[in-house]
UniProtKB/Swiss-Prot annotation:
Keywords: Chloroplast, Plastid, Ribonucleoprotein, Ribosomal protein, Transit peptide. It holds the Pfam family Ribosomal_L12_N. It comes from Arabidopsis thaliana (Mouse-ear cress). Belongs to the bacterial ribosomal protein bL12 family. This is Large ribosomal subunit protein bL12cy. GO terms for molecular function: structural constituent of ribosome. Residues 170-187 have a biased composition (Basic and acidic residues). The lineage of its organism: Eukaryota, Viridiplantae, Streptophyta, Embryophyta, Tracheophyta. One of its GO terms (biological process) is translation.
Length: 193
C-alpha cells in the first residue's frame, strides 16, 4: 500500500516530566509532524483508500454473439453428430466426460454399413410406476412411500392421486423390483417400465 505522508502527532506535556527537565528544554505547544520523503508515484494530496470491484452476477453478464452462435449450432446437431463432437473434443483437449456417463448410455449404438444397429442393448434403467391405490390402502402406501424416499407427507399424498404416476425414474432392475414389492405389500398396483 502506498503512503505519501505518515504523520505522527505527539503532544508532550511538561507535567509528565520532572520539573527540572521541563524547565531546561523548550517543548512546542502544538503537535510535531514527521514526514517521510517517499511517494511511490502518488501525489502528496491524495489519501489512502480501499478499492472495491463490483462483479456482476453470472446471469447478468451479456452473452457474446460468438457464444450464442456456437450454442445454436450445437443445439441443432443430430445425436450422431453430437457423439462425433464429443469424441473430437475429448481427443483435441485431452478431457474425458465421466460425469455424463448416464447420458452417454442413452445414446444409440453406432450404425453398421447396412444401417442396422450393431447389437441389441439391454435396458439398464427402469421406471417404477404406480398404476392405482385402493382407497383402503392409501395410508399404508403413503407410509411405504415416505419410508423409501425423502418426500414430505403432502408430496407423498400427491403421488397417489391421479394415475398412473412415476414413483422413481432411472433406477436399476434390483431397486425397481424391491420398490415394486414394498408398494404391492402396502396395497398399490405397480408396474416397472
Amino acid at each position: 500500500m502506498a503512503a505519501t505522508t505518515l504523520s505522527i502527532a505527539t503532544t508532550i506535556r511538561s507535567s509528565s516530566f520532572s520539573s527540572g527537565l521541563a524547565s531546561a528544554h523548550h517543548f512546542p505547544s502544538r503537535p510535531l509532524s514527521i514526514e517521510f520523503p517517499f511517494s511511490f508515484g502518488v501525489s502528496s494530496s491524495s489519501t489512502l483508500s480501499h478499492r472495491a470491484i463490483y462483479l456482476h452476477p453470472i446471469s447478468a453478464v451479456k452473452t457474446p454473439k460468438k457464444i450464442k452462435k456456437i450454442g445454436s449450432e450445437i443445439s441443432s446437431l443430430t445425436l450422431e453428430e453430437s457423439r462425433i463432437l464429443v469424441d473430437y473434443v475429448q481427443d483435441k483437449f485431452g478431457v474425458s466426460i465421466l460425469f455424463s456417463a448416464p447420458a452417454a448410455a442413452a445414446l444409440p449404438p453406432p450404425l453398421d454399413n447396412g444401417g442396422a444397429t450393431a447389437s441389441v442393448e439391454r435396458q439398464t434403467t427402469f421406471d417404477v410406476v404406480i398404476n392405482d391405490v385402493p382407497r383402503g390402502n392409501r395410508i399404508a402406501v403413503i407410509t411405504a412411500i415416505r419410508a423409501m424416499t425423502s418426500l414430505s407427507l403432502s408430496e407423498s399424498k400427491e403421488l397417489i392421486e391421479g394415475f398412473p404416476k412415476k414413483f422413481k425414474e432411472g433406477v436399476t432392475k434390483d431397486e425397481a423390483e424391491e420398490d415394486k414389492t414394498q408398494l404391492e405389500e402396502a396395497g398399490a398396483k405397480v408396474s416397472i417400465v
